[in-house]
Structures are given as C-alpha cells and as structure tokens.
C-alpha cells in the first residue's frame, strides 16, 4: 500500500507501543470462540411469536442457564429464563403476588442469578464487548457487581452494600431489566432474517421496529418484502397487490393505523361497484372476529384491488416484452360476452367474475376515477414517514442474498434448468444467470428505491417481475395463478409449477455448484426460506446431505395446519449448526404467569471438527487484514 495510507493509519495511534497493543488486542480477539448467529425466516407479521423466539434465542437462553446452574431444577431454570425473556412483565407480576419484603428478597436473589449468567455468557467475549453491551447508566456498577458476584467473605460486605444501596434508591428492578437485556444480547450476537417479514400476520411494522433497534442484523429480501418496497417506491401494481393481500387476511389496520394510509376513496369505490363473492371471502386466522359488514367490505375491496391489479399488470406486460409474461396477460384472453377465458388452448367458465369497470375493447385501460384513486394512494404510500423509515431499513440492511461466514443465504431459489444449469434472464439483449442474476436484481431494486417518483421505469417494473417472474429468485415458478384461483373452478389451472431448483436442491452436487458460483467452498451451507416445509407429512428441512437447510416452517398461522409446526430457526455457534423446530406460541401473559415457553426440538445439522474461532469468520478476515497493516506500520513506524 502507498505511504499516504500508512501515514493516515499512524495518526490513529499515539506511539509505536500503542500500535503493538492494538496488534496484540486484535490477535487475541481472533482466537476467541465464534459468536452465535441466529437465523429466522418467513415471520409474516407474527410479532408475538417472532419476539418470543428472539427473546429466548431459540432455546439458547435455557441452555446457557442449565450449563451455568446444573444444580437447578427445571422449574427454577424456567423461572429465571422467564425473567430474562420478559424482565419488566415478570417483575410486575411478582410485585403483585408478594409483599414488599418478599419481593425485595426475590429481586436480590435473582439479581445474583443474572449476574452469574452474564459472567457465564460473556466468557467468550472481550471485557470491552461485554462492557459495551451494558446500558451506559449502569456500566460501572455492573462491572463491579459481576467481578464480585463470586467474591470471598473478604468482599461480601462490599458486594452486599452495593445491592443495599441500589435497593434503597429504587434501582434494583431497573438493574435486573438491564441485566436481562444484556444476557439476551450476548447469547445471540447476530440475527439473519432470510426474508418475508410482511403479509398475512398483523404486525410486520412491529417486527421491523424491533429489528431497527437490534445491534447486529441483516435481511435477505423475500418476495413479500419486495412488493411492499415496490409499493412505497412508486409501483401502482405492487401497491394494489399489497392492499389486496391486506384485505384478504383482514389486516387493513397495517395500512390505516400503522402506516397512516388513507383508504377511504378506494373503499367507497369498492362499495359502489362490487358485491361480495365467495372466492374473495377474507381468510381470517383463529381468534380474529369481524362483523358481517366488515367482512363484506374486505371482500369488495379485495375484488376491487384484484381487478385493478390485473389491469395494471396487463399494461406492464405490454411495455416489457423482455419479461416474457405474455401468457399472463389474462384480461385479453377473456370472452366478456360469454364470461369465459381461454388458457393454453382450453376454455373455462369464469365464476362470479365481476368487472364493472372493464372495457372489453380495451380491458387494461383505467377509468378516470381509477386513475385518481391510484394517484391518491401512491402519494399516501410515498409520504408515509413510518413506511419510509421501514423501507429505508430494508434497503440499508437488506440484499438479494448474503454470503456470511461460509454460508449462502437466499430467500427463495436460484433459477435452474432441469439439467442443473443456471437459468438465464435476458433484458436489453444481455443475459444474466446464477450470482450475476441476483446481483443484477439487487442493483435494480436499489435504483427503484432511489427514484420513487418513477412508476413505469425498468427498475420499478422489475420489482413486479421479482414477485411473479419465472426467473425471479424470490418466486421461482412458471406463473402466479392468482386470477385462476379467484375465478376458475378447475383446480388444475391453480397449479404453480416450481422451478427445477426445488427438486434438484436435494442433490449435494447441485448445492456445491451453487456455493462455488458465489465464491464459497463445499463445506458451506445454503440457507433458504420461502417454501413451507410440511414436517407433519415427513418432509425433511435438511437436504443434500446437510448442505441445504430450509427454515420456513410456519411462523404464519395461516400455514401451521399445513406444516404441523410453528416455524424453524437456525443457530450457528462455535460448535456447529443446529436446526430448531418450534411449536406454536401462546401469549406473553401465559409466558410470564405460568412460565410457558415455546417447545423447541433441536437437531444437529453440522458439527465442526475444530471449534470455530473469530478468525474463521467474515469479521475475523477483516481483523486479520487490519493486523497485517498494523504489523507493517509497526515495523516501519519511524518511516511514516
């Protein structure tokens, strides 16, 4: 490197000895055990279950407690674990159940347990990292308490006096909350969300707010995330799809209450033009209660947005011949006089097909009223401050894929031909396949996000292609049969044929080929979400001799009857990779009052021959590069 670089580097250190100290410090960090990574996918707005799995670290907290307190009964472990998961709620509950003296005893006793737990889970980190994990307000006092928690009788009075003073000042409960937060942070160092935060469940906004406040997180965009990002960034087609899905699952509150998007104009339009239809009956999860009028309105809104979606999609198909979606220009295949449609040479009756604003001569054209409604809604989406913040987070922390610590994370698939070759997508006479295809999509997504004022440019239209396109890594099927499922009785038309990837991913050589295409060796793993694993039918989420792990197991309540479980997560620590299968979450109240936890079953996916160190990770490679530069600076310090 040039002299100027080392001169700038030298300015960061007060002396040659300071450079040596930094070399020693970074070298020591490289020899520490690798921190724990936590993988989640397809959480689909299910905030309570998502939040609980985050808080219990997919069972990691209890595992640490059992190691730290081998003498404890399962009930005692459960009690301390609940305090770590939900400290404020647990303290409030205990305060109501006990008199003041007993509650103070409870706090002091459990504070000691938490101090010992922090000391235990912090063993594999530097003291500096543990210190930074503490809230600044309690940083000094917590360091003192942790150092003295196992003190001899010589220092017992010192330790007790600190606790007594904290108790007298009313700070004991706050310290417990701070310790619980620190334990959770140290138990899991980094979170990967492998796509699909949005749709189906009621609280995707809460999930993103939670992620924004996490110290270390990344996101691999899912198809349901992309369509929301597109709606914010100027795609009227994606926007109609977003509203339609919210209406389908009874989640208009996400739009109206969470994001402040005014739906009044389109709701009034829906009331005027449509009547309820059985195919558009809202799909409500157990426990959601709506009046007959509310259900009817959701039904009509879903029909409205579906027809507008099909009109806008027809326009996109016409202006983007490169997308090769002509077979999905369905409005032009309809015989409106006979109420029939011709698909692949077969003619089908349309059931309860209401299209009061479609002009059979120009089926894709919008009425003047529809154009005004769409323009108004687009403006509402673009000017939602909260949605802007959430999409900004997804842009900053997200990508089409991630190579991290030897593993490849992709939400859906890598499009393949039946022979295992990468399937290419051609745009403007240039073909993209494999990693190049995902890099191209990633670049276009960022172009779209940078120009929300554009509604019909290539980047914005590609966002829709990612939702429905045959070569989309986020979709990976020949067609999305939304129209057929609504209007055609023959279920053979509802089938969405998957890309060959989904059969070929059972083969180790295919996964090795994909890993190599992304610059990873055969010892890595490919982590997917997107397709729910039907465990109750015997489907195995671990495929290709352990090289591929699919972690969509049914966080979305709508899919739990199909999967038989309530989600998979993955843990990757210094000893190897574990897949965790979760049973459904009940409530925070039950967790606090009864100590109920998600029942989780762990399976070992891969065990390392030698314990992984920081130097074996992405972070470690950066540190080793820094050390090499510092060693050059140290050797030639006087020259710079």
From Swiss-Prot:
Listed under catalytic activity are: beta-D-fructose 1,6-bisphosphate + H2O = beta-D-fructose 6-phosphate + phosphate
Q: Which cofactor does it need?
A: Mn(2+)
**Family matches, as SUPFAM superfamilies:** Metallo-dependent phosphatases
Q: What is its EC number?
A: 3.1.3.11
Task: Give any single GO term for biological process.
Answer: gluconeogenesis
Pathway(s) of this molecule:
Carbohydrate biosynthesis; gluconeogenesis
Q: Does the keyword Nucleotide-binding apply?
A: no
Keyword list (alphabetical) reads: Carbohydrate metabolism, Hydrolase, Manganese
Q: Which domain of life is it from?
A: Bacteria
- GO MF terms, alphabetically ordered: fructose 1,6-bisphosphate 1-phosphatase activity
> Could you say which enzyme class this protein belongs to?
hydrolase
User: What HAMAP family has UniProt attached to this entry?
Assistant: FBPase_class3
Which family does the record claim for this protein?
Answer: Belongs to the FBPase class 3 family.
Protein name in UniProt: Fructose-1,6-bisphosphatase class 3
């Amino acid at each position: 490197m040039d002299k100027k670089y080392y001169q700038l580097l030298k300015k960061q250190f007060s002396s040659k000895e300071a450079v040596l100290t930094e070399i020693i410090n970074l070298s020591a960090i490289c020899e520490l055990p690798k921190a724990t990574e936590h993988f989640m996918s397809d959480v689909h707005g299910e905030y309570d279950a998502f939040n609980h799995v985050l808080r219990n670290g997919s069972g990691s907290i209890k595992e640490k407690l059992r190691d730290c307190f081998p003498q404890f009964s399962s009930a005692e472990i459960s009690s301390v674990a609940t305090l770590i998961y939900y400290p404020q709620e647990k303290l409030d509950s205990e305060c109501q159940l006990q008199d003041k003296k007993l509650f103070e005893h409870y706090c002091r006793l459990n504070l000691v347990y938490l101090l010992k737990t922090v000391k235990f889970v912090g063993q594999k980190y530097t003291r500096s990292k543990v210190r930074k994990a503490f809230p600044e307000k309690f940083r000094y006092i917590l360091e003192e308490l942790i150092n003295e928690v196992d003190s001899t009788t010589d220092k017992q009075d010192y330790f007790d006096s600190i606790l007594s003073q904290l108790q007298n000042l009313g700070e004991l409960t706050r310290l417990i909350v701070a310790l619980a937060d620190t334990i959770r942070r140290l138990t899991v160092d980094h979170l990967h969300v492998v796509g699909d935060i949005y749709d189906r469940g009621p609280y995707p906004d809460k999930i993103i707010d939670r992620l924004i406040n996490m110290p270390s997180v990344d996101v691999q965009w899912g198809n349901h995330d992309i369509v929301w990002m597109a709606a914010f960034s100027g795609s009227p087609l994606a926007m109609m799809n977003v509203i339609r899905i919210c209406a389908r699952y009874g989640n208009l509150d996400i739009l109206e209450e969470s994001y402040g998007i005014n739906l009044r104009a389109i709701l009034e339009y829906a009331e005027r033009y449509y009547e309820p239809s059985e195919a558009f009956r809202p799909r409500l999860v157990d426990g959601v209660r709506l009046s007959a009028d509310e259900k009817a309105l959701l039904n009509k809104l879903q029909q409205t947005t579906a027809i507008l979606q099909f009109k806008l999609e027809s326009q996109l198909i016409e202006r983007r011949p490169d997308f090769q979606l002509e077979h999905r220009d369905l409005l032009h295949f309809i015989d409106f006089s006979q109420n029939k449609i011709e698909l692949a040479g077969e003619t089908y009756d349309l059931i309860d097909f209401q299209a009061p604003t479609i002009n059979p001569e120009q089926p894709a054209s919008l009425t003047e009223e529809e154009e005004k409604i769409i323009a108004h809604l687009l403006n509402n989406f673009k000017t939602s401050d909260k949605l802007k913040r959430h999409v900004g987070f997804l842009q900053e922390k997200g990508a089409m894929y991630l190579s991290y610590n030897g593993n490849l994370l992709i939400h859906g698939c890598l499009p393949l031909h039946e022979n295992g070759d990468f399937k290419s997508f051609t745009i403007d006479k240039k073909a993209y396949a494999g990693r190049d295809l995902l890099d191209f999509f990633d670049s276009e997504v960022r172009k779209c996000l940078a120009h929300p004022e554009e509604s019909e440019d290539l980047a914005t239209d590609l966002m829709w292609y990612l939702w429905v396109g045959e070569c989309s890594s986020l979709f990976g099927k020949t067609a999305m049969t939304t129209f057929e499922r609504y209007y055609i009785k023959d279920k053979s038309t509802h089938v969405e044929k998957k890309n060959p990837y989904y059969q070929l991913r059972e083969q180790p050589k295919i996964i090795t080929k994909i890993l190599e295409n992304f610059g990873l060796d055969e010892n890595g793993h490919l982590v997917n979400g997107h397709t729910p694993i039907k465990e109750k039918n015997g489907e195995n989420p671990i495929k290709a001799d352990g090289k591929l792990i699919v972690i969509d197991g049914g966080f979305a309540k709508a899919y739990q009857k199909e999967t038989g479980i309530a989600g998979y997560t993955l843990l990757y620590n210094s000893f190897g990779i574990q897949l965790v299968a979760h049973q459904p979450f009940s409530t925070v109240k039950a967790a606090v009052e009864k100590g109920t936890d998600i029942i989780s079953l762990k399976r070992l996916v891969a065990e390392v021959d030698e314990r992984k160190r920081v130097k074996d990770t992405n972070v470690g490679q950066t540190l080793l590069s820094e050390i090499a530069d510092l060693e050059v600076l140290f050797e030639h310090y006087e020259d710079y």
